[in-house]
């Protein structure tokens, strides 16, 4: 009798996902829902889907990504809708290209809900473990080994390790080996990746203190309630209006706050005499030390946000710091409303390892080890939404590869997810990457309102979107097209009643008859205001929304679609079996970069830093001659 044998179903899987954060959740759901026996192995099953930093989902560009995840069949949007306690549409004074939802979530409920859904998911098992080694045979992944020496076999492995690879926490000059306060640090896995040939770097992030609600004087702050309008992140859920029980609050730092920060900089692991933190932090989420040192301002905004319904802890958005605890409490008590504040958990910075994402294909599969995928902060990104999107794509593509089917690679012109992944694998990262609307050159096409129209076909294609929902999208598209064509032919007379209405809306009266579609192109005019002029009134609010946007922004949208068409002629020109050292007239830098990145198309090659238009011309000439 062999005492150490185990049943096959205990250690043999088709897909293993390492890490139970936002990337790991989506990867595991995608794999299991596509029918593959999946293991989610995580260092703390009680912290699955934990909001390690701000208790919020969405935001500028990020909110659109959550909608895209939902359209592809992911879970983040649905769980956000179930657990949000305050939600607002951002940038409502601007055009639809930059509008996005942001929700405060009950972080405890969010984590519990995600864990329950994962536990209930068919084909999926959650298990405790800290992975120390990747098992490889003949250049192909075959499994992992955990810190107990237990091995697990699989045909594909997805690494979603967050900030835990050699994670190290800093509070002043005090340090602790952990990827998150009160959690562990995974030390062996980085060494395994380095041995396999991966280039590894180090980044830094941070989080603010959590403070006690009853020690806050909200009377000195500005209240921010949830929107009065109903909202939902998920296309599967009915929009709802939330109760105004959990407002956020706005306050600010003071000159006295800044003086304390400057006085304590000598003890800062970032700016002190001994610079303990060498890694680069996120440009778009700087610590309060960075703000005070780099920006000459009297004050900086602070958003005071509830962490959940059943907790007294509040999150201080905008006050990330790694200053010593004494500096933290003194500085906080100089802020209006926080004069008597009590800290529940101190702020801290954390350093962690990431891999160079140019070592990945656009599918998020490694170029070095076959069937090994990476998603989330291990790829150099920051943010729950960015991580979840990568996890979903990695999970889908791992499943498609095991099926022997073509992978999904989303274009820059059809999704923010496509923009992000293309940026990562083509340009790489020298600081934590955050999605911004400015990164998307076709952002007017990538709106909050049309994510399902853009991406549901892919979700349905891989089996993550049900047939009834896909049929609903097809029907919606047909209705939009039908009604726009119809409205182009609905005549509106230049009558006194019509002109009185137009003047009341603040727009020019008619001198002659026109078409209803032409009137709807005016920025001041809504369909509902002119609905009585339509012989076939539209009641579907989704159809009305799309008609108004498509008509009002028709010129811009058509111009952008023309740009996309020109761009995609090159984007779709594949680079197959090209030995770049044999391409004449390439610059030395371009040759080195092309050899490293191994772009799959001329479009991808053109976006590699250091590759010039002359290099692209040389490459095009060579490919055409072949």
Swiss-Prot record:
GO terms under biological process: tRNA methylation; tRNA wobble uridine modification
Subunit structure: Homodimer. Heterotetramer of two MnmE and two MnmG subunits.
Gene: mnmG
GO cellular component: cytosol
A GO molecular-function descriptor: flavin adenine dinucleotide binding
SMART domains named in the record: GIDA_assoc_3
Keyword annotations: Cytoplasm, FAD, Flavoprotein, NAD, tRNA processing
Keyword tRNA processing part of the UniProt annotation: yes
Family stated for the protein in its record: Belongs to the MnmG family.
Function, as annotated: NAD-binding protein involved in the addition of a carboxymethylaminomethyl (cmnm) group at the wobble position (U34) of certain tRNAs, forming tRNA-cmnm(5)s(2)U34.
Classification of source organism: Bacteria, Thermotogati, Thermotogota, Thermotogae, Thermotogales
Cofactors demanded by this protein: FAD
Disulfide bond positions: none
Keyword Metal-binding on entry: no
Residues given in the record as FAD binding sites: 19-24
Matching InterPro entries: FAD/NAD-bd_sf (IPR036188), GIDA_C_N (IPR049312), MnmG (IPR004416), MnmG-rel (IPR002218), MnmG-rel_CS (IPR020595), MnmG_C (IPR026904), MnmG_C_subdom (IPR047001), MnmG_C_subdom_sf (IPR044920)
Protein name as it appears in the record: tRNA uridine 5-carboxymethylaminomethyl modification enzyme MnmG
Coiled coil feature spans: none
Protein location: Cytoplasm
Pfam families assigned: GIDA, GIDA_C_1st, SAM_GIDA_C
PROSITE patterns from the UniProt entry: GIDA_1, GIDA_2
């Amino acid at each position: 009798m062999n005492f150490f044998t185990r049943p096959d179903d205990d250690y043999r899987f088709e897909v293993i996902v390492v890490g139970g954060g936002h990337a790991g959740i989506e990867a595991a759901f995608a794999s299991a829902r596509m029918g593959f026996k999946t293991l989610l192995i995580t260092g703390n099953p009680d912290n699955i889907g934990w909001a390690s930093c701000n208790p919020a989902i969405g935001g500028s560009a990020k909110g659109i990504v959550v909608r895209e995840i939902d359209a592809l069949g992911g879970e983040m949007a649905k769980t956000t809708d179930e657990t949000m306690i305050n939600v607002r549409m951002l940038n409502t004074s601007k055009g639809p290209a930059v509008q996005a939802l942001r929700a405060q979530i009950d972080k405890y409920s969010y984590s519990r809900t995600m864990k329950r859904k994962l536990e209930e998911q068919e084909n999926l098992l959650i298990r405790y473990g800290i992975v120390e080694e990747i098992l490889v045979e003949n250049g192909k992944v075959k499994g992992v080994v955990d810190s107990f020496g237990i091995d697990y076999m699989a045909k594909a492995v997805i690494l979603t390790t967050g900030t835990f690879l050699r994670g190290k926490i800093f509070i002043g000059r005090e340090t602790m080996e952990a990827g998150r306060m009160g959690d562990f640090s995974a030390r062996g896995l980085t060494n395994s990746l380095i041995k396999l040939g991966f280039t590894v770097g180090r980044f830094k992030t941070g989080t603010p203190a959590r403070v006690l609600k009853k020690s806050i004087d909200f009377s000195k702050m500005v209240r921010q309630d949830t929107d009065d309008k109903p909202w939902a992140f998920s296309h599967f859920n009915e929009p709802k209006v939330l109760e105004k029980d959990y407002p956020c609050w706005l306050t600010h730092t003071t000159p006295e706050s800044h003086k304390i920060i400057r006085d304590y900089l000598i003890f800062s692991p970032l700016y002190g005499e001994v610079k303990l933190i060498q890694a680069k932090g996120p440009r778009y989420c700087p610590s309060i030390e960075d703000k005070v040192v780099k920006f000459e301002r009297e004050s900086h905004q602070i958003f005071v946000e509830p962490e959940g319904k059943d907790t007294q802890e509040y999150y201080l958005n905008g006050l990330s710091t790694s200053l010593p605890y004494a500096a933290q409490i003194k500085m906080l008590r100089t802020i209006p409303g926080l004069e008597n504040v009590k800290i529940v958990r101190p702020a801290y910075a954390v350093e962690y390892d990431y891999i160079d994402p140019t070592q990945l294909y656009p599918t998020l599969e490694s170029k070095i080890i076959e069937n090994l995928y990476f998603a989330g902060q291990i790829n150099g990104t920051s943010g729950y939404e960015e991580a979840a999107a990568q996890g979903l794509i990695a999970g889908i593509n791992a499943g498609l590869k095991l099926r022997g089917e073509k992978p999904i690679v989303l274009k820059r012109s059809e999704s923010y997810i496509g923009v992000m992944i293309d940026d990562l694998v083509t340009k790489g990262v020298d600081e934590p990457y955050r999605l911004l609307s400015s990164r998307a050159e076709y952002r007017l096409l990538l709106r909050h309102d049309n994510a399902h129209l853009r991406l549901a076909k892919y979700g349905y294609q891989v089996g993550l979107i049900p047939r009834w929902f896909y049929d609903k999208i097809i029907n919606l598209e047909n209705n939009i097209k039908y009604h726009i064509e119809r409205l182009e032919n609905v005549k509106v007379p230049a009558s006194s009643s019509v002109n009185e209405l137009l003047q009341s809306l603040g727009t020019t009266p008619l001198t002659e008859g026109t078409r209803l579609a032409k009137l709807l192109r005016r920025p001041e005019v809504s369909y509902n205001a002119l609905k009585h002029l339509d012989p076939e009134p539209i009641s579907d609010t989704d159809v009305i929304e799309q008609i108004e946007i498509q008509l009002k922004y028709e010129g811009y949208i058509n111009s952008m679609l023309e740009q996309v068409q020109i761009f995609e002629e090159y984007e779709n020109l594949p680079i197959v079996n090209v030995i770049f050292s044999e391409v004449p007239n390439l610059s030395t830098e371009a040759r080195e970069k092309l050899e490293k990145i191994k772009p799959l198309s001329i479009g991808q090659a053109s976006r590699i830093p250091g590759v010039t238009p002359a290099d692209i011309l040389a490459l095009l000439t060579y490919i055409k001659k072949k």
